[in-house]
C-alpha cells in the first residue's frame, strides 16, 4: 500500500515487550497456511459498489480542539462511508482460510508503516502481515497516542475490542511495535489525543487480501486453482461472502454491492 513518506528508517525505537525477532516468529509460525510455488495461478477480480441513499452518519464532523496549526481549524470531516461514482472505497476483500499459496511480498520500503501526518493516519486502510510494524509520527510538536485494537466478533455483529498496543508518541520518528492478532484479522486504530483520527487494518495469516482501489476495483492474483470462500469487509457495513471457483491462469469476476436497505 502506498504511504506518505519513506517506509524505512535506521533508528526505529522498540516499544512494548515484543521484539522484532518475536514478530518474525509470528510470521514463521502462522498456523494453517503454507507458502508454495504457485504454477499458473488464477486471479480474482471485481468491484465494490454502493446502491441507494448514503446513511445519515456517512460523514461525521468532529471539532478540532488540539494542535490547530497542524491539524487544521474548525472541524474534521471523518468519512465513514466513502462513495465516488458508485464505488465503495475503504473496503477490504480476502480469501477465507486458504491453506497454501503464494508468499508474502515485501512491503514498500521494507517495513509496514502507520504514519501520523497532518493529524491523519496514512493510509486510512491497509493490509499488513502479522509481525513488526513501524508507528511513525511526522507531526513535529504534536503528541499522538495510537490505540490499536483487534476487532473480535465482526462477522457476528457483536464486536469486542482487544487492545494490542496503546502508547503516546510525543516526538517525530518511528517506534516499532508488533501486530499480533489472537482471534481476528480485523483491526481498528484511533488516536487517544485527537478524537478525529481513525483508520483500519487487516492482518490475515496469508497474503490473499487487498484494499480496494479508488474506483472500488480489486484484484487478488496468483491464486491456486480451487474453490474458496471470498469475503468482503467494510468497517461500517460489515462482512459479505460468496463462493468462488478459480481456474488455472484464468480470471474470476466477483461483484460486491452494499446498501443501507
PLM regions: where:
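Extracytoplasmic copper-binding redox domains, predominantly the cupredoxin/blue-copper superfamily
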Residues: 2-261
Amino acid at each position: 500500500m502506498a504511504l506518505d513518506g519513506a517506509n524505512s528508517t535506521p533508528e526505529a525505537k522498540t516499544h512494548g515487550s515484543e521484539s522484532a525477532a518475536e514478530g518474525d516468529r509470528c510470521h514463521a509460525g502462522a498456523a494453517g497456511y503454507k507458502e508454495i510455488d504457485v504454477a499458473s495461478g488464477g486471479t480474482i477480480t471485481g468491484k465494490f459498489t454502493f446502491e441507494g441513499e448514503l446513511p445519515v452518519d456517512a460523514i461525521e464532523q468532529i471539532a478540532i480542539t488540539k494542535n490547530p496549526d497542524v491539524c487544521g481549524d474548525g472541524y474534521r470531516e471523518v468519512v465513514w462511508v466513502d462513495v465516488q461514482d458508485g464505488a465503495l472505497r475503504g473496503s477490504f476483500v480476502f480469501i477465507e482460510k486458504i491453506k497454501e499459496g503464494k508468499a508474502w511480498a515485501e512491503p514498500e520500503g521494507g517495513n509496514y508503516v502507520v504514519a501520523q501526518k497532518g493529524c491523519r493516519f496514512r493510509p486510512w486502510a491497509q493490509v499488513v502481515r502479522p509481525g513488526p510494524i513501524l508507528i511513525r509520527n511526522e507531526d513535529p510538536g504534536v503528541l499522538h497516542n495510537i490505540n490499536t485494537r483487534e476487532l473480535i466478533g465482526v462477522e457476528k455483529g457483536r464486536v469486542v475490542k482487544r487492545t494490542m498496543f496503546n502508547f503516546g508518541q510525543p516526538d517525530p520518528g518511528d517506534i516499532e511495535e508488533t501486530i499480533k492478532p489472537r482471534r481476528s484479522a480485523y483491526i481498528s486504530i484511533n488516536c487517544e489525543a485527537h478524537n478525529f483520527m481513525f483508520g483500519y487494518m487487516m492482518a490475515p495469516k496469508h497474503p490473499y487480501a487487498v484494499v480496494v482501489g479508488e474506483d472500488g476495483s480489486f484484484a487478488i492474483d496468483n491464486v491456486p486453482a480451487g474453490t474458496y470462500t471470498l469475503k468482503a469487509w467494510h468497517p461500517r457495513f460489515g462482512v459479505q461472502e460468496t463462493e468462488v471457483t478459480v481456474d488455472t491462469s484464468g480470471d474470476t469476476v466477483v461483484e460486491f454491492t452494499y446498501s443501507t436497505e
